[in-house]
């Protein structure tokens, strides 16, 4: 983690010294984490390691007992989620977040209408999102008729309406079939190409390893190791307590 006195890239996410206790027992023990613009970062670990708690402290769903969260030089440790969103952090929960009875187009337009745009600008942004995410052919479909993979595409497109600096994805590979997983990985790669930082937590380590530039592996409330996938997967503690000795990325 860089010095607090250094000039920060306005789109760099930093979590510094995050701590969370439950009934006096530490769940998260001083976690430091960085996501650069245009970088895909995975937060992984066994159940009970503290990764979900850490992720939710960054999202704003859980308040940290100690530590700070920054986007660039903007501190947002105690900001509610809506303020974090205005500052540039979009969050995509695991559960379906689309309006089920609205069409795909209406789902995107509902968010576009919250922005200060002319009718023409709204229409242009809508068409760009539909095209970029390959959902133009679904524009008039009600959200409840979509497959898991199609719904995920719409949700990510919706999260990008506000042009965030960073997107936080909670279990993006859960509840979708293998073909759709590859599809979503392609979309996440697109986010990287647009210069958007991506922080992902997911139980599917194998799929995460295929797309992440860097990983943070949590064991017992702390970061055991961080680095590129080929480095962290060789760590003996990670092998012993999380991935297993026979683990291979297919």
Placement of each model-derived feature along the sequence:
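Conserved ABC ATPase signature
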Residues: 142-146, 150
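The feature captures the beta-strand-to-loop junction immediately N-terminal to the Walker
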Residues: 44-46
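Conserved ABC ATPase "signature" region
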Residues: 109, 120-138, 185-189
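Conserved catalytic motifs of ABC-family nucleotide-binding domains
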Residues: 163
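Helix-to-loop junction immediately C-terminal to a conserved catalytic motif
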Residues: 59
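Catalytic Walker B motif of ABC-type/P-loop ATPase nucleotide-binding domains
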Residues: 167-171
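ABC ATPase NBD coupling module
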Residues: 75-90, 95, 119-123, 139, ...
């Amino acid at each position: 983690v860089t010095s607090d006195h250094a000039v920060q890239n306005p789109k760099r996410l930093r979590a510094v010294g995050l701590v969370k206790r439950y009934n006096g027992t530490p769940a998260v023990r001083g976690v430091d984490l960085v996501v650069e613009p245009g970088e895909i970062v995975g937060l992984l670990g066994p159940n009970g390691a503290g990764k979900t708690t850490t992720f939710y402290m960054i999202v704003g769903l859980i308040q940290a007992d100690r530590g700070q969260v920054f986007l660039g030089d903007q501190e947002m440790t105690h900001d509610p989620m809506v303020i974090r969103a205005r500052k540039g952090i979009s969050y995509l929960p695991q559960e379906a977040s689309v309006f089920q009875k609205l069409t795909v187009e209406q789902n995107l337009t509902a968010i576009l209408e919250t922005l200060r745009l002319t009718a023409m600008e709204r229409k242009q942004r809508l068409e760009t999102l539909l095209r970029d995410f390959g959902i133009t052919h679904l524009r008039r479909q009600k959200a409840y008729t979509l497959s898991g993979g199609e719904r995920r595409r719409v949700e990510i497109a919706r999260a990008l309406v506000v042009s965030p600096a960073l997107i936080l994805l909670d279990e993006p590979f859960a509840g979708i079939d293998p073909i759709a997983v590859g599809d979503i990985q392609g979309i996440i790669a697109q986010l990287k190409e647009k210069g958007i930082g991506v922080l992902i937590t997911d139980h599917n380590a194998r799929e995460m390893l295929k797309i992440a530039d860097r990983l943070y592996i949590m064991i017992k409330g702390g970061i055991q190791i961080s680095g590129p996938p080929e480095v962290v997967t060789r760590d003996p503690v990670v092998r012993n307590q999380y991935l297993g000795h026979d683990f291979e990325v297919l």
